[in-house]
């Protein structure tokens, strides 16, 4: 009994542990190993619970669906095995453990780039299901029971993971130092592990710490209840259940300068000589211990964090992207985390507890992603925030399905937020001075308007009486055909000009666009694609616009500099036959692009989806205008732009029935430019064939289903009239339609050298459009 007691340090503290922290020796959606072979892993947000790993000397076993994780790992060694999907992760010295998402079995692996680093569970425990797992410095303890079960308590198993003396590889074996008759008979709710000790919450109440080094922790009997535990190598910190304050035991240097009593936390992580926690109010990270914490991100909230020896990584709450920083004073990371979306928490059976919300996967704007968990009945419960970081104010409180919303102080427009943002002294120093400023602005504006009217009265008559002089805007848009008239006998020159083009892009506030789209609600949605969602919006001044909102995947896979470069180019290009960018917003990490609204939908809708049919005169004008838009992108835009996805659904019709080319992007590889330009020509030829025949590009109900395969042989035989759309009455003069067929056939030739340029096509189709006026 004395030997047993020497191995066992028992503290019956009235302790409640509903979920562990994400620290060393505990478990969470992100974890880190220690030592010279340190590496990190996190559970991704794909809905498959795949594991992403990165580290300086880590040979990625490449998760089945994550191809980019290895790109951020310094080691170039490739491994031939996969890490299975996990429900939870926990890190030790040079290895990580987890619970498999499908079987609840334990799985441990190291940083070694071979299968020998993947068998770190003794045979006796490999088929056992576990509900909790905690990797210590060189041992692992786990609570028996199915992870997703409503009953998450059970007896524990412990085993040792040590280094072989001959080749420094890791091996797993049972460890009698952690076995005790008292421990084996107890039922645990949770478990955490450190260097030579483990601590767990007992189902009947209290906490038990056991192992060779457990007596060094120096626990004192207390009646406090605790919510979260994190174990360092020689210390433990816990979050009080009611006050959310932190208490620590063990090695003093690990928790020197620990948080003040008024600091409240929801999560903890531990390194060898430090602890870090996520604050309850604004979800920012605060650290303490014997390290340098000057590099902690300020103004950023986190969902989960994990620490190795000198690096802390976390999952940002605003976009679920990984962020890492040093805690030893060095500003240079030895490796960067991968650009992947990570799970904000662990999947579990609901409902969520008080002061928690169920994370909604739809906010990631990922098509077909409805849950972050492999089992759809499970959910990720995240702690609610109650306050915001400096520079933001609380605009919406936490609900059952969403966290609180923080809005930049730059958007503060009333007294409810001015106190928080401290705007009284800086923005509203004196009411009378503010009124005087408004008066000066009003008088100045009126005087300017009067001056403009006087100048206009003098200058405009001279312009009107000088028909031979054209201004720059007229020259720029003189080739545009405006609103089509149903009277086809009207001369082409008398067709009304296209609407004016917005001369510059506007910077919008996020709040403006949220209001304009009714909070980006589904009933405002116009469409969706790989970039994100497109919403119909009505601005405060009554203008109708289309707002394209990038999804999270687009944001993290697009370099910020690349986006800024593309945005600068899009802001500067203007033409009456493209959908022009009106403005943008990048507040709160969003990427919102505001475009002209096209009320008559797409060409595809009118040709194939039962919308109002288009007359032959209008179809040919649309063909010509589309060619003009592509010609501008190819030859006049700076730098020139290759569309890359020319199709009838990317030809939009504005309020005047003018064709506008939409959804064009940039090409960065100069080696592919010529090929891509010819691809634009080919795809434009397919659009011409759709206009001519009324058939889709691919129609499985037709034989042959490919429109090019069906039409080209007929056109080359001189029988183009046989493929003309029969749902529209043939005009008296079919010659323009036959010319249109010939132009389309040139575009879809297999040899790019035989294809015309967009300038040639625009010129030819302009002549065809003139001939079409005598239908």
UniProtKB/Swiss-Prot annotation:
Cytoplasmic side: 461-775
Signal peptide (residue range): 1-23
Tissue specificity annotation: Expressed in roots, leaves, shoot apical meristems (SAM), and floral buds.
Catalytic activity: L-seryl-[protein] + ATP = O-phospho-L-seryl-[protein] + ADP + H(+); L-threonyl-[protein] + ATP = O-phospho-L-threonyl-[protein] + ADP + H(+)
SMART domains: S_TKc
Record carries keyword Metal-binding: no
Carbohydrate-modified residues: 57, 102, 167, 213, 220, 241, 261, 292, 328, 360, 414
Transmembrane segments: 440-460
GO molecular function, one term: protein homodimerization activity
Localization terms from the record: Membrane
Active site feature: 645 (proton acceptor)
Binding site residues for ATP: 526-534, 548
Alphabetical list of Pfam families matching this protein: Pkinase (PF00069)
Topology feature Extracellular, residues: 24-439
The protein's Enzyme Commission number: 2.7.11.1
EC category: transferase
Domain Protein kinase positions: 520-770
Family: Belongs to the protein kinase superfamily. Ser/Thr protein kinase family.
Protein name: Serine/threonine-protein kinase-like protein CCR1
């Amino acid at each position: 009994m004395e030997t047993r007691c020497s191995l066992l340090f028992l503290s019956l503290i009235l302790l409640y542990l509903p979920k562990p922290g994400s620290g060393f020796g505990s478990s969470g959606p992100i974890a880190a190993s220690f030592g010279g072979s340190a590496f990190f892993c996190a559970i991704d947000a794909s809905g498959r619970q795949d594991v992403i790993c990165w580290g300086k000397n880590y040979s990625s076993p490449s998760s089945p669906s994550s191809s980019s994780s290895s790109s951020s790992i310094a080691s170039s060694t490739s491994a031939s095995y996969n890490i299975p999907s996990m429900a939870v992760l926990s890190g030790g010295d040079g290895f990580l453990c987890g619970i498999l998402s499908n079987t609840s079995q334990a799985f441990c692996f190291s940083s070694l780039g071979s299968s020998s680093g993947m068998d770190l569970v003794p045979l006796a425990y490999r088929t056992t299901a576990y509900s909790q797992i905690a990797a210590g410095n060189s041992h692992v303890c786990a609570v028996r029971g199915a992870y997703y079960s409503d009953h998450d308590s059970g007896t524990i198993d412990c085993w040792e993971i040590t280094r072989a003396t001959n080749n420094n590889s890791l091996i797993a074996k049972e460890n009698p130092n952690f076995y005790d008759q008292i421990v084996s008979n107890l039922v645990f709710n949770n478990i955490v592990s450190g260097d030579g000790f483990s601590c767990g919450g007992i189902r009947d109440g209290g906490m038990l710490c056991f192992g060779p080094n457990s007596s060094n922790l120096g626990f004192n009997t207390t009646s406090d209840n605790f919510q979260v535990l994190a174990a360092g190598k020689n210390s433990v910190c816990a979050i009080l259940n009611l006050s959310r304050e932190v208490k620590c035991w063990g090695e003093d240097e690990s928790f020197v300068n620990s948080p003040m009593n008024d600091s409240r936390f929801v999560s903890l992580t531990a390194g060898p000589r430090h602890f870090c926690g996520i604050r309850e109010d604004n979800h920012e990270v605060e650290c303490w211990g014997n390290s340098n914490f000057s590099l902690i991100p300020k103004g950023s909230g986190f969902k989960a964090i994990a620490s190795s020896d000198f690096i802390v990584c976390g999952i940002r709450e605003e976009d679920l992207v990984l962020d890492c920083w040093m805690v030893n004073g060095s500003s240079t990371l030895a490796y960067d985390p991968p650009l992947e979306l990570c799970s904000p928490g662990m999947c579990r059976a609901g409902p969520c507890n008080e002061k928690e919300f169920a994370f909604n996967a739809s906010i990631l704007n990922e098509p077909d992603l409805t849950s972050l968990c492999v089992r759809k009945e499970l959910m990720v419960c995240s702690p609610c925030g109650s306050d915001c970081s400096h520079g933001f104010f609380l605009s919406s409180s936490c609900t059952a399905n969403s966290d609180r919303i923080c809005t930049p102080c730059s958007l503060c427009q009333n007294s409810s937020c001015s106190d928080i943002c401290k705007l009284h002294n800086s923005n509203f120093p004196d009411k009378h001075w503010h009124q005087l400023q408004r008066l000066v602005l009003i008088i100045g504006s009126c005087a300017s308007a009067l001056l403009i009217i006087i100048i206009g009265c003098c200058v405009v008559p001279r312009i009107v009486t000088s028909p031979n002089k054209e201004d720059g805007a007229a020259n720029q848009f003189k080739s545009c055909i405006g609103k089509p008239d149903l009277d086809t006998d009207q001369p082409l020159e008398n067709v009304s000009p296209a609407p004016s083009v917005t001369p510059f892009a506007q910077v919008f506030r996020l709040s403006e666009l949220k209001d304009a789209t009714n909070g980006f609600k589904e009933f405002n949605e116009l469409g969706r694609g790989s970039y994100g969602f497109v919403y119909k919006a009505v601005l405060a001044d009554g203008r109708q616009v289309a707002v394209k909102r990038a999804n999270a995947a687009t944001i993290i896979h697009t370099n910020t500099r690349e986006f800024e470069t593309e945005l600068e180019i899009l802001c500067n290009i203007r033409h009456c036959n493209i959908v022009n960018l009106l403005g943008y917003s990048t507040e709160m990490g969003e990427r919102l692009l505001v475009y002209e609204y096209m009320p008559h939908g797409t060409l595809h809708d009118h040709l194939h989806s039962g919308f109002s049919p288009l007359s032959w005169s209008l179809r040919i004008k649309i063909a010509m205008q589309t060619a003009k838009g592509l010609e501008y992108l190819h030859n006049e835009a700076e730098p020139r732009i290759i569309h890359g996805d020319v199709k009838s659904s990317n030809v939009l019709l504005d309020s005047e029935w003018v064709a506008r080319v939409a959804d064009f992007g940039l090409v960065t590889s100069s080696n592919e430019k010529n090929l891509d330009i010819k691809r634009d020509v080919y795809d434009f030829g397919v659009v011409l064939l759709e206009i001519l025949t009324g058939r889709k590009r691919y129609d499985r109900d037709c034989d042959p289903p490919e429109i090019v395969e069906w039409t080209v042989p007929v056109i080359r035989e001189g029988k183009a009239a046989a493929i003309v759309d029969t749902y529209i009455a043939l005009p008296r003069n079919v010659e323009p339609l036959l010319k249109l067929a010939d132009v389309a056939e040139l575009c879809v030739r297999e040899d790019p050298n035989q294809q015309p340029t967009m300038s040639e096509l625009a010129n030819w189709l302009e002549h065809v459009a003139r001939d079409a006026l005598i239908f």
